[in-house]
Structures are given as structure tokens and as C-alpha cells.
Amino acid sequence: MNSASKKAILVLSFGTSYENTRKLTIEAIEHDIADAFPACPTYRAWTSKMIIAKLKKRDGLTIHTVKEALEQMLLDGITDVIVQPTHVINGIENDQMKADALSFRDRFSSIVFGNPLLTTEEDNQAIVRVVADEFRDMDPDTALVLMGHGTEHYANTVYAALD
């Protein structure tokens, strides 16, 4: 990176209209990323335009879309963008986010993408270990049901791989 370069991280989430959930999940992840990479400014964008509109109307809270966040990054002099989604799988929202971000590829020196949580078989195995460890002391007569909301996207196959 030359001296004129300025790198930043765009943390990308679907979004939530529940304030407590936002603080415990999305904001916690954003803070962890900011703490891990203090030399890189972090920006927020959400993919759910419905939730963005709801928060604007109900709470007066402005959350950027991917394109709005990238426009702001340009105004702030950012030259290199790292996009890190908080998505669980590579679904429809993730594909749309990439398309939106890549529409800016000629306006930044680089745009690179991190992966959603469950991208590789190794990711699947790691999450199974973490969940099993988290619930290892559960009463053996108690059933544990874990659900993903599912999608028509081919990435839905990850749920069968976890079974």
C-alpha cells in the first residue's frame, strides 16, 4: 500500500430492527473487528432495505446500504476496501452485496471480500465443534433443535451438510 492509500473495512450485515439484538450481535462484531484492526476505519452497511427503512421511520436511525456506505468511503478518501459480511451462508443477500460492491470496482484501488461464517467444510466442522462444546452439559433427555431460516439459493445445502 503506497502512502496515498487508505484502507478501510466495511462490515456488512443483513440487519435487525431489535435494538438489544443489534447491540449483542452486529455491534459486538463491529467492535471486535475495529479492535482487531485499529489502523483501519470501519464502516457499517446492511442489506435489508426493509429494516433500514423501519429503523429510519421508527427511531430516526440512519443505516447505510452497501452503495451508500461505499459512497461515504469515497468521500472519506478510502482507496482500498475490505468487505466482511456477517452473513451465516453465501446466500442471495451475500450475492447481491457483492454485486453492489463490485459496481464500485473502478472507483477504488481494490475491493476484497471476506467470507460468511459457513463457507467451507472446515467452517462447518468448526461450528459443529463449537455448538457441541457449548451444549455438552445439557441434560441427555433434552432435545436441542437448531434452525437456519433457509433459502432457495444453492447455499442452502450447507444446512444438510451440518446435519
Which residues does each PLM region occupy?
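Active-site-proximal alpha-helix that buttresses catalytic centers in soluble enzyme cores
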Residues: M1-D163
